[in-house]
């Protein structure tokens, strides 16, 4: 995961804890923001934007719109397996790996889960027991909607690996 430390508001550098708001698409997260469904302090998890789920990571613009909501910008966290632009700011955690589609921790976050972020100590914690985490991971299944895409994209999704290992096509 990557956090642009210089862009994080000072009050969010340590001791952040928020309730997860979970979105499986960028559009769903933007709709929630625009319709006032994000509350101060929420941890906005926007997943399935990584290499496997979106063929090369989706440009993530949620935090840019969050800037227009001062109270939210200074109290919320944004966590995604997608990528940020160089101009991103706020408590934004991107490129989370392994991505949700590969069974990474973002895939098992549930609405209302508590998430802690300590930027200084480089720690992100999903506040559930080890047993609950193991259970959720063992039950997690992600299915790529193959019928909606051309054959070469289906091959890419079937074979691409994690960003942490360079997104190598495993043949």
List PLM regions with ranges.
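Feature captures the catalytic cores and cofactor-binding loops of soluble hydro-lyases/lyases
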Residues: 1-171
């Amino acid at each position: 995961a990557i956090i642009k430390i210089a862009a994080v508001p000072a009050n969010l550098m340590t001791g952040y804890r928020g309730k997860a708001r979970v979105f499986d698409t960028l559009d769903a997260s933007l709709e929630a923001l625009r319709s006032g469904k994000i509350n101060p302090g929420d941890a906005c998890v926007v997943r399935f934007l990584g290499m496997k789920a979106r063929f090369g990571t989706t440009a993530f613009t949620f935090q840019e719109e969050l800037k227009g909501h001062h109270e939210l910008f200074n109290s919320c966290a944004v966590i995604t397996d997608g990528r940020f632009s160089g101009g991103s700011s706020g408590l934004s955690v991107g490129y989370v790996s392994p991505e949700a589609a590969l069974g990474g921790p973002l895939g098992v976050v549930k609405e209302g889960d508590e998430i802690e972020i300590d930027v200084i100590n480089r720690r992100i914690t999903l506040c559930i027991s080890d047993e609950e985490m193991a259970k959720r991971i063992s039950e997690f299944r992600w299915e790529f909607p193959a019928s909606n895409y051309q054959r070469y994209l289906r091959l890419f999704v079937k074979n691409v690996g994690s960003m942490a290992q360079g997104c190598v096509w495993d043949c």
